[in-house]
Amino acid sequence: VGLPTCWDEWFPEVARNYGLRGADLLCYPTAIGSEPDHPQFNTRPLWQSVIVGHAIANGLFIAVPNRTGMEGLIQFYGGSFIADPFGRILAEAPENEEVALVAEIDLAHRQDWLQLFPFFATRRPDTYGKLTDPVTNHRQSDGHGLMGPIPGISAE
């Protein structure tokens, strides 16, 4: 079992490292919600897709408890879920509701996945050089990313 937290869920290297070290299940305790600077932008589908992608790419079961409620300007949207290595959502909480999720996890499905998708054995570490370069600040002082504002999203 691996226990990375919150922000780690956005980085594929974290899930890959746990998968390579033999974890069958990751649990990402999370506090994610609305974006006060972009109130019309819903991050929930992106958040869930990224994590489900980690499950698929690394043959992992992933449980993601997310908080609910309001704190300051942020509305935490809940939507906790459990995914399997094939990208299926095994259990999912409604948005903005606190619930206990339960799902049956058959670890043999991970072994099936490892045989079907030999991603670990066919990796290309010789192409990963940039992954170990020092981190630099990619955020511009105007609050936009390197490529400017998010298309279709206004900061107002």
Positions of predicted regions on the chain:
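CN hydrolase (nitrilase-like) catalytic-core segments centered on the catalytic cysteine
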Residues: 6-101
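C-terminal beta-strand edge segments of enzyme domains
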Residues: 61-156
